[in-house]
Every structure is written in C-alpha cells, then in structure tokens.
Amino acid sequence: MIATKNIRGLLVTNAFLKNGKFVEHYEWLREAAKQQEIRLDLCDNAMLHAIYGMESDEAKLAAYSFIIFWDKDIRLAKWLERYCQKRGIPIFNTPEAVAACDDKSETFRLLTEAPEEAFSLIPSVVAPLTFAAVGYTDVDFLSSIEKQIGYPMVIKECFGSFGWQVYLAKDRKEALRYTKKLAGTPFLYQKFIAASAGVDVRLQVVGTEVVAAMKRRSKTDFRANLSNGGQMEAYEASQEECDLAVRTVLALGLDFAGVDLLFASGEDKPANMICEVNSNAHFRNIAECTGVNTADKIMQYIKRVLEGKQERNHRG
C-alpha cells in the first residue's frame, strides 16, 4: 500500500506518435491524475532506453511510485519491468498484457488456453512463417485454409491499429495477392462474420467494470473502425456483453482495455464474439458519445490499487 498524497507516476508513450489525437490522450490522463492529487510526468521511448551491458537509465525512475505504459515498445517495457519488480513498483498495463493484445494471434492463443473459460473467437488460421527476402515460394497451404474459412475471408496483420492492416479477400486471386504482399509479416486468415459486417461494439473496461460502451457502424466498409469512416453511438451493453468483456480482460491480465465484440448471431442478439482487444485503446470518441472520460476511471482505479483498496487484475 502506498500513501497517495503528492505521489508521482510516469506515463511512458511513443516518441514518434505526436499527432493531436495521441497527445490529447496523454493530456487527459495527466489531468485525470491531477484530479486524484497525483503528479503524472510524461516520458517517451526516445528519452528512456532499454540498456544492457553498461550503465543504464534506471536513475531516471527513482522518483516514481508507478508507471503507466501507454506504448507497445515491448522491449522497453520488459526492461522497465525488471527494474520495477525489484522495487515493488507497479506497471499499468504489464508488459505481458500489452504484448498479449499487440499480437492478435497471441490474444487468441491466450484466450483459447484460459483456464475454466470459454470464449467465442473468430475462426482463424495463423499464416505460416516466411521471410520478406524469401516470400511465399509455395502457396499450396492456401487450399486447406480456403476449405476451413471460405470466401470472402478477412486477412489481418497480427500487429496493427485502427483497422488499417485489415483486408477483405473476396476470392482466391485476392487472397493470393494479400498473401504475397504480406510475406515476412505475421498475419491471420479469418472467417468473415457476415452477420456483423461493418458493425461492432467497443466496451471500455477498467478493472472489473465496463465503464462505457459504443456501437460503431460503417455503411461503406466491412470494418467498423471510426478511422475508416465509421459512425458511433452510445450503446447500452447487456449483462452478458459486460461479463464477456470483463472475463476477457481478466484472462489477459489487463488493468484496462477496449474490448471489441462482433454480433456473430445478428444485431438482434448480444454481441458475443471477440474481435480483438486493445490495451491502449483511445478514448476520446467513446467520451464524446457517452460522456464518460475513461482517463478519470483509469486514474481512480490506479489510486485504489496504490492505496490497497482494490486488487489488480491478474492473468488466469
């Protein structure tokens, strides 16, 4: 338990994501921390380095009682974790949890292996590994994937955000084109969920609570992402949907996340299929359509954890 009076935390971000929507989120978190009487300093991954075999940057961390890792630089996160574990300093979210969400194949693997849990996942096949300099010299493997998934099929890079690395292959010709284009890049072949084409729900989870939810819809694209032209509206999530989102966050060991669900059985029934999970989900849009500031919820949660009033989420 830490006395939170005049406490300092460190918000670690990416040095190369400096456009307005990223910086705005950092400022929202800092302002939310201020409301909790917590000083939250900003540091990016060009200011703090994972260093081995010589004097490191550990001295820069001495003043902090917790870290919010709002980046996907997993190598840096693991270096930070080594330092923090020795001193009992919590990292929100943990490097393992961030990595579990960053790699979409890893997300599905962990959810499949979650003890005593059953999650409905998009039927997916992980593309076989090749290298950019080699390419796919033989694509016979695609025949068995076609039989398992059918067309149209979604081809999704394992590492990506805002729907930008997600493609729809209507036939074998398009599947081959994307397959060859992505040689050397980890990706998935996924079943196209027609009942949820262009529509999904985002549930924002903090701790064990769904704090806000919105429905996203696109009339022109199979992806519902707002960055691709989708529209948003506040959504009243059912208890079933909330339970699913919270179970997902717990299974992945996340403190907070955006959980995206698909309407696998149609919009007249609860969204029941996990699409993906974002450990660093942007929250401006969901704030605009629901009035809920997720930054406030995150900092309230962190303060409760630091004060020993709430247990953290742990995988398993």
Where are these regions (language model features)?
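Conserved N-proximal alpha/beta basic substrate-recognition cap immediately N-terminal to
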Residues: 15-132
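Rossmann-like NAD(P)H-binding beta-loop-alpha module
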Residues: 122-150
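Protein kinase-like catalytic core scaffold
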Residues: 153, 211-212, 257, 273-275
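Glycine-rich phosphate/pyrophosphate-binding beta-alpha loops
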Residues: 278-291
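Extreme N-terminal starter segment of soluble prokaryotic enzymes
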Residues: 4-10
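A long amphipathic alpha-helix within ATP-dependent nucleotide-binding catalytic cores
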Residues: 222-272, 297-315
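Phosphate-binding site of ATP-dependent enzymes
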Residues: 159-248, 252
